Amino acid sequence: MIKTTLLFFATALCEIIGCFLPWLWLKRNASIWLLLPAGISLALFVWLLTLHPAASGRVYAAYGGVYVCTALMWLRVVDGVKLSLYDWTGALIALCGMLIIVAGWGRA
């Protein structure tokens, strides 16, 4: 389960970077060349999703919980926003949901 969780975090990071770089280009007038690493990051994101040993719908559902946590870490580290009690609570609930789904992969 630890390997799966780490893979989910790597997947989420690739997705966030792949979306953040075009956002920088569009909102902050950054270089259009950021679209190249953004495309590579999103392609890596898609490839990483294929490495999970479950049906795609289960993978996407479980991945959503980790994505929430990763996005909140991004909010704190990159955007410099202090997380609220609601952020922490939501992340904990999302992560619990992911763990429940992943724990049932072999039983479904």
UniProtKB/Swiss-Prot annotation:
UniProt key word Membrane: yes
Domain of life: Bacteria
TM helices/strands, residue ranges: 6-26, 31-51, 61-81, 85-105
Disulfide topology: none
UniProt keyword Cell membrane present: yes
Membrane topology: Multi-pass membrane protein
Family classification: Belongs to the UPF0060 family.
Name of this protein: UPF0060 membrane protein YnfA
Native source species: Escherichia coli O17:K52:H18 (strain UMN026 / ExPEC)
Lineage: Bacteria, Pseudomonadati, Pseudomonadota, Gammaproteobacteria, Enterobacterales
Gene field: ynfA
